[in-house]
């Protein structure tokens, strides 16, 4: 998906189109007032105060019609410089522009004119409105002025603009495809997820079928970790403020945390991450160098107060479950343990068919002694160790100077999802600081107490985001082992006792063999029930008629296919068990 903000050509064009939209709105609603209309990654938007009027699809159509008229007229776009006092006089009846102007430094201010419309703007802009003719208004929403919930609501209208009609058409097709792949839409159709503002924004809930998928992901990654010597724990999702002051998160991360809760004279917070709890688990026991590495893992509930505008289903919420682990190692073990983490990441990606990713090795800026822990030898050794592992494994990566955490270098594995922008799915970070903050030690070979190094790592990232990623990549066509309902039994008739008895016998047979089967014997036509099962992306549809009941066989069709295959019950079960055991990817 194109990034309008980073493409200079598109950025200028879309900025101008935002002004065309504002001019059209002003023609239709003379009382309208405007806050800001920037270019963003997805195109442009303008925040508009329409008084008691509300934007709907009919209003959008009317605005687009007026915009086309303005573009056809081909109005010249002029840049002017005015003094701050002149600008204040020019916009004296517009509280929003006055607010913007009052926060500008003294000196000349730029405004842009096009026909009967003038707007405060830094620019740049194209020179004629006719260049903005290939546009589309794509969505609208209500937002608080300045993003502050204590302020009134404004109408935000989004749009896109391209130099050619062909580029616009191609982009709109991409948007339509993205809409079909959106995990929120898929989650609703497949009865996986729900949300309700009464529960809270950014707090989606997993329905029974969605929780089945979530549990399969949990079982999958915990099984892999157990085989590699991980020890799983469970820790509370709250902690004292003092815990986070000790870790340093209170000073550096407080704005992303929920407010403290005062209980019996103590301040508690919902945890945003699990490192402090895992540090305390390590500190609970004395350790020798012979005990290390110690790998503590947890599927942990975390809470972060994300801005409401960034929330997106289970991809980005205020509550999520992280596939977290902390590896306590000696300096000599950094390379081997990091190598094992990288292996685990890419073995996992192979199981899910993930191939479109980018590895980023984030390093310190050696000139910045303020941001980064000041130990050149430590940094050089750590960065060289991570480079060596990636090079030895033949993994392509880019280096980003100055992007390391203050406590050590890290590897991020970023994916390009089917919907939206690139984000980090997996990470492994070296930490030389946190163990010291908690006075963690081990007794080394020489009998002296030493401070361990910690590797923070998340393979699936958060299970929630990983599930969103897989749903969008597969369009909900999950591999059989992940599918919430693996086989749907559909008797051709629901009033045939012999057929219904066989259907229930088969249902029990599959359940007894750990197949997630269901049976639909409603008094609906077979075609209707088949279509409904297709919408829910059920991998196997079992069509049972009199012949199957008499022969004790199974006639099945795969999701999205029309042809039917008939086999014995045992053959069908063996086929499913093999597909589940080998974790075959979606067909």
Predicted regions and their residues:
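NTP/phosphate- and nucleic-acid-binding module
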Residues: 1-35, 39-41, 47-587
